[in-house]
Amino acid sequence: MTKKAKRNIVHKRFDSIVKGSQDTKKYRGLELTNGLRVLLVSDSKTRVSAVALDVKVGHLMDPWELPGLAHFCEHMLFLGTAKYPSEREYFKYLAANNGDSNAYTDTDHTNYSFEVRSEKLYGALDRFAQFFLDPQFTESATEREVCAVNCEYLDKVNEDFWRCLQVERSLSKPGHDYSKFAIGNKKTLLEDPRTKGIEPRDVLLDFYKNWYSSDIMTCCIVGKESLDVLESYLGSFKFDAIKNTRKERKIWKDSPFGPDQLAKRIEIVPIQNTGQVSIKFPFPDLNGEFLSQPGDYIAHLIGHEGPGSLLSELKRLGWVISLEADNHTIASGFGVFSVTMDLSTEGLEHVDDVIQLVFNFIGFLKSSGPQKWIHDELAELNAVDFRFDDVKHTMEKASILAECLHPKIRKNFETALKTSHHAFNLPEKNEYIPSKFDQKPREPVKSGYPRLISEDEWIQVWFKQDNEYNSPKQGIMFALTTPLVAKKSKNVVAFKSLDTIIEETYNARLAGLECQFESSSSGVQIRVFGYDEKQSLFAKHLVNRMANFQVNRLCFDISFESLKRTLTNHAFSQPHDLSAHFIDLLVVDNIWSKEQLLAVCDSVTLEDVHGFAIKMLQAFHMELFVHGNSTEKDTLQLSKELSDILKSVAPNSRPLKRDEHNPHRELQLINGHEHVYRHFQKTHDVGCVEVAFQIGVQSTYNNSVNKLLNELIKNPAYTILRTNEALGYNVSTESRLNDGNVYLHVIVQGPESADHVLERIEVFLESAREEIVAMPQEDFDYQVWAMFKENPPTLSQCFSMFWSEIHSRQYNFGRNKEVRGISKRITKEEVINFFDRKIRKGGAERRKLALGLWKK
C-alpha cells in the first residue's frame, strides 16, 4: 500500500460530508497548501475510477483579440507534456486500460475528466496531473489543432440552437464578456491575429500561465483505494505544486441584459422547419440558495404539464406543442429564466396571445403565493432520489439557478402580469410519489437469470427477483407483437400518434418512473423503470390507454404537426446521424425511411388513429418481463390484468401464430465485395463518410473479437484521422450489433471530400494493423483482460441486458460469462487473422459498405 505523502500538502480538511443513507462510499474534502480544493471518494466496490478537474476560467475570459482562446486551450492541453511528450500518450494509456476522457469549455469554467480501470488509476492520474504542471503547447500542434477547432465550428454553425445562442450573445450589452464568440474558428484564432501581428501561440501561453492557477481549481478523485491512499496520490503527483498565481474567482456583478437590451422582440429565421417562442428574464445567480431552491420551484410550476397548467391551456387552444421552463446560471453572478414553447402553425398566428397567457400564468402564481405543500413535495422527491441515488460516482450536483423574475418587462404585458386566467390551477398532488421502500418477501427459488414462470398461446411471462442490489426499484417490460404496425408506412404513422400517451405521464416521471413507448417492425414495447410501489398501477394505466386510445381533434392535429415537423427536420440532422440512418435503410429489411413516413402523414385521419388499436389487437402475442423488487405472485397477477385489458378491448382477437411473427432481418453482403453509396444533404458545410464492415452473424465469438478489435483501433483512429490528418472533428470507430449481424464502423465527419476520406481510412486501417502486430504481448494481454473483466452493471443495465436476450429470442443470459471464457483464449494472432479476413483490403471475408454524405 502506498504510504501517505511525508510533506504536509494539506491546508484544511473537511470530513463531515453529508451523504445519502444508502451510500456506502467514503468522502474527504481537502484544501491543499496552494489553494486547490479536492474531494476524495473511496468506493471499494467500483471497478472504474474517475477523476475530474475544473478550472474557473471559460470563454468569457477570452481576450477580445482572440475569440475562442479558452476553448482552444482546452484542445491544446492534451497534446503532450514535459514528462510525457508524445501527443498520444494520455489517450493511448486510457485506451489500453478500457478508459475514456472528456473535456468542455463553458462560460466561466473549463472541465477535464477521465475514467479508467481502477487498477490503473495511479498511472492515469500521473499523466493527467502533468497537464496542469508542465504542458508542451508545441508549435507543430498549434495550427493543426486550430483546424480541429474549425471543424467543430463548422459542425455547429448551421444548427439552430447555436445560431440562436450566438444572436443572444451578440445582442447583449456592448463590451460585456457575454457578447464574445465562444467556440472560435480558424479566422479568429489564426488568420485575424496574425494579420494584426499577434502570434496565437504566445497569447495561448500567456492565457494558460495567467488563468490556470491552483487557487481557482477544484478536483474530484473517485477510486477503490482508501481515502488515505487517494490522499497520498496528491503528493505523489505534486498536485500541491500546481502554480498559484493568486487569481480570484471572477464574478460578474452586472447582467449582460441592461435596459437597452430588455423589452425587445427578436425574430430569427430558422434552418429547420420549426416555430418557437422563447421568453427570457434576467435572473440573479442563486447557486447559494440550495436549501430553498426557489428557481426550481418556479420552473416546476410554469413547466408543469398537468390539468390547469399553462401548457394544458395552450394545448387546448391549439397553439403550443410543448413547453419548457428553465432557470439557468449563465456564469457566476448572473443567470436567465426562460420559458420556451414549440408553436403549432396556428400558434405562429397567435404569438402575442401566447406571450400574454404566459404573463397571465405568472400573475396567477404571484397572486396564489408560495405553496408550502408544493415545496414539500419537491423536497420529498429530491430526498428520495438522494437516498437511493443510482449514480455510481457521486460528483457535485448541479447548482440551483434563479429566484425571482426581473421586474423590467415589456409594458404591453404588464396588465397581463397583474391578472390571472380562468383555466389556471395549481397542480394536483402527485399520486405516484413512493412512500414504501421495503424489500419484498424473498422467493424460495433464487436464480441469477430470468425464469419463464408462465406461458400459453397468448403470453410469455419472465421474472427475476433482485437478489444483488437490495433496491426498492424494478423494471417492467411489456412487448406486444403484432405485425400490423410495420406492414404499411401509414400504419407506422398512425401508431406514432399513440406517443401522446407518454405526454400524460408527467407526474409519474416526476416521481422517478422512467417510461419509454416504442414501435418496431414486430409491434410495440412499453418499458417502465423506477420505484416499485406504484409501478404496476402505472403500467396498467399505459396499456389501458393504448388499448382504448382516443384523442380529440385538436390534440390529433397538434400531434401530427409535431410528427411531420420531426420527420421534416431529420433532413437537417448532423451528417453522421444521417449516415447511420441511411446505412440501416440499405441493410435492414422492413423499415421505412423518414421521407416515406412523411409522404403519408397527410393521408392519416383521426378515424384511422381511433380504429388502429382495435385493428392492431386482431391478432397478437404478449411478453412480460419483471425484474427487481417484486415477487412471482405479483408478476403473475400483473400479467393477468394486462392480458384482460387487451382481450376486453378486442374480444374477437386471436393469438398470433408462430409464422406470423415478423422479426427484423438484414441483407447478407457478399464476401470480397464492397459497395459505395453517395447521398446528399443541404444543410451542413461538412460531410460524413461512414464505412461499415459486416463481420457476420452475431455469436459470442464474433461479438467478442469485434469488440476487442474496435478497442484496439479506436485510439489510433482518433490520433491519425483527427489529430494528425485533421480530416474532421467527429472521428470514431464503433462495434455495433444490429438485427442479427455484427459490424465494425469507421466514421469521419469533416470538410474533406468523400473520395479522399475513403482513401485515408484504408491507409489508416493498414496502420492500425501494423500497431496491433507491433503491440507487445504483455500490452495485448492486459488490453484483453481490461476489456472483458467483469464490471457489475446497475439494476437498470442488468434489466435491459436480460430483456435484450429475451426479445432477440437468444435467451443466452450467461453471455457475459461466456465472453469472459472466450477472452481467456483469444490470442493476438487470432485478432490479426480476424482483421485480415474481415477488414483488410483483399480479405476473403471482407464485406464493406461505405456511405459518403455530402452537401449538394
UniProtKB/Swiss-Prot annotation:
Record-level Gene Ontology MF annotations: metal ion binding; metalloendopeptidase activity
Key words, A-Z: Hydrolase, Metal-binding, Metalloprotease, Protease, Zinc
Binding site for Zn(2+): H71, H75, E152
PROSITE patterns reported for this sequence: INSULINASE
Domain of life of the native organism: Eukaryota
Record EC number: 3.4.24.-
GO-annotated biological processes: peptide catabolic process; proteolysis involved in protein catabolic process
SUPFAM superfamilies: LuxS/MPP-like metallohydrolase
GO cellular component: cytosol; mitochondrion
Active site positions: E74
PANTHER family: INSULIN-DEGRADING ENZYME-RELATED (PTHR43690:SF18), NARDILYSIN (PTHR43690)
Protein family: Belongs to the peptidase M16 family.
Protein's name in the database: Putative zinc protease C28F5.4
Source organism of the structure: Caenorhabditis elegans
